[in-house]
Amino acid sequence: MGTLGKAREAPRKPSHGCRAASKARLEAKPANSPFPSHPSLAHITQFRMMVSLGHLAKGASLDDLIDSCIQSFDADGNLCRSNQLLQVMLTMHRIVISSAELLQKVITLYKDALAKNSPGLCLKICYFVRYWITEFWVMFKMDASLTDTMEEFQELVKAKGEELHCRLIDTTQINARDWSRKLTQRIKSNTSKKRKVSLLFDHLEPEELSEHLTYLEFKSFRRISFSDYQNYLVNSCVKENPTMERSIALCNGISQWVQLMVLSRPTPQLRAEVFIKFIQVAQKLHQLQNFNTLMAVIGGLCHSSISRLKETSSHVPHEINKVLGEMTELLSSSRNYDNYRRAYGECTDFKIPILGVHLKDLISLYEAMPDYLEDGKVNVHKLLALYNHISELVQLQEVAPPLEANKDLVHLLTLSLDLYYTEDEIYELSYAREPRNHRAPPLTPSKPPVVVDWASGVSPKPDPKTISKHVQRMVDSVFKNYDHDQDGYISQEEFEKIAASFPFSFCVMDKDREGLISRDEITAYFMRASSIYSKLGLGFPHNFQETTYLKPTFCDNCAGFLWGVIKQGYRCKDCGMNCHKQCKDLVVFECKKRAKNPVAPTENNTSVGPVSNLCSLGAKDLLHAPEEGPFTFPNGEAVEHGEESKDRTIMLMGVSSQKISLRLKRAVAHKATQTESQPWIGSEGPSGPFVLSSPRKTAQDTLYVLPSPTSPCPSPVLVRKRAFVKWENKDSLIKSKEELRHLRLPTYQELEQEINTLKADNDALKIQLKYAQKKIESLQLEKSNHVLAQMEQGDCS
């Protein structure tokens, strides 16, 4: 679990009054203490509180602590002494006793006071409970057992007829409170900038990027409440602690985003530019005193997937490497983060700490000090120390950040950081960018010299609702800034620039109008990309195996040719899909496992059976073929251009990151193997040609690629997509509105007729199913009778 893993390898055993054991545990921490040598504000506050508590600071029984809290109130309900003991007791009591058990002890004291006819003590007990409800009312909303015990107390007081006491311990106002911890600072549009706010990564200044990352970090940090820190200590993990889980996901997401943005550039020079930009972002984060995001950025740049890029590092100036070394030294874990602790202690006003380091301190303190001292006394010193450290973190949330955030850029970054990669996947991309030298020993993913994934054992949970919300907000911001004529479309160039700000490397877009992208299309793009990378989309993953193809084969994912002599690509053992190495993790189609004994229809019977069904399915997804004529299926069926033909643009950003706009025509049929031999250049086959044209070739020099014929023993795998690439003037590709208006759509009567036909077919199938079930039952009955008859014959013989 990263930094915290060692502290959580074994479950904590509660110690009850063993002085020798407690001394051994305390002496186990020599000079390398988790706390800085110089006194901090928390230590000074702790010393003052110890003095104010007097004899209780050395340890006291639980009953004495409860009695001291009750006696803190006078007859009118006012505090007659410091509230420090009340604060410590009501916030940290869960370390030694649950909230319901503490309230049960208070109820017992109330019953004893009633029995002794002591109304003054009963009133003070109710004042204590009222203080608990008023100051820490969140406990009563989150703890079901505490709520049930409180209801028992209210029923007891009501049964005794004490109306004043009932009003004091009333909890009905809790439900009226807005207990969600939302960021009070409103996001304002950055109107101080003269230029238009850019949503493009390449146009963002390091200062802008660092400010908005700080805003997101502070927004997440501010939502971690006092009880969240306490729950982390008591439960020993961040499960069932959503605010802390989100903080972990943000920190790890920023680190992955930094790595992927560097690796998304195709050349070493461009990768070096992104690397330099993130170093400048780190410098700005240091100036803003945002150490948590600084740790994430530097950790991402120091990760082995980036540090191994020798060609990229050769383009990084010496001054930048020097700054990286200084930042790494600042955040180094040597001497228990002594450099960071010194720098953090010197900071004033707004600052965001490295949360993992301070949580490690809390765990060290929680594990090192016993809960109880000798004679069963509660270790008040431990409660005070934990209370002061948590309070110091909570007080940082009250200082507003010295920056102004732009709502649109916040939405863009929020979606960009929704990443769900593993280290192996990132390292694979790094190896694809710069293959390792065969003479050098193979590298494996290693941890950076600074701690980033301080709780790497906790992986963010991809939530479809959250992703959908982030996508919708980002799309609204994109059209607000780039849809100038407000017609609901943005240009292809603008979309490609925006998409370059994300580490998504491949996705398919259906376009209503060539050259323009609508709101629905860009929403579908990011939703599909997010679902792919958050592992939400594929319910049945493929079982890809590296394969050597003996005949020409195309990738079923990107329609590209599988080049090479041996091991050209990957083939799914279950469904037979073929793809490139870089495409196998980007497949959006689920694995459709083949039947063991498929029924092979004859070549002549092409109008019925699975072949015709697959062809009719494939016809709905057909794309424009050459304009000279209809595209012909390999089995001889031709499909004319019509309303069922759709344009599709595929963004290809593979290892070379070269974007190619493809117009695809998907041929769907059964075939025996993915590697059928086919004529490449020459005469037309019976099925018709597949044209690949280029501006450098004349009409006579056009390359014709013929589809392969149908095999007599087809497999249920769909034929690979074939790409029709055309280099043309973009203006000639834009369809006019008149053409779109003339597209024929089915009438209501035609749809109604088709529905009735399908219903009739469905009814007929139901009748056949019932007949088959009855036939099965009769055969089973005959079988059982036959078995009984054989048994009777055996007995007679």
From Swiss-Prot:
Which amino acids does the record list as binding Ca(2+)?
Answer: D483, D485, D487, Y489, E494
Q: Which SUPFAM superfamilies match?
A: Cysteine-rich domain (SSF57889), EF-hand (SSF47473), Ras GEF (SSF48366)
For this protein, the record's InterPro entries field holds: C1-like_sf (IPR046349), DAG/PE-bd (IPR020454), EF-hand-dom_pair (IPR011992), EF_Hand_1_Ca_BS (IPR018247), EF_hand_dom (IPR002048), PE/DAG-bd (IPR002219), Ras-like_GEF (IPR008937), Ras-like_Gua-exchang_fac_N (IPR000651)
Q: Which residues form the EF-hand domain?
A: 470-505, 506-532
List the residue ranges of the region (PT region). Answer: 718-797
Where can this protein be found?
Answer: Cytoplasm, Cytosol; Cell membrane; Golgi apparatus membrane; Endoplasmic reticulum membrane
Q: Where is the composition biased (Basic and acidic residues)?
A: 1-12
The entry's family comment says: Belongs to the RASGRP family.
From the Swiss-Prot or TrEMBL record, give the protein name. Answer: RAS guanyl-releasing protein 1
Organism whose genome encodes this protein: Homo sapiens
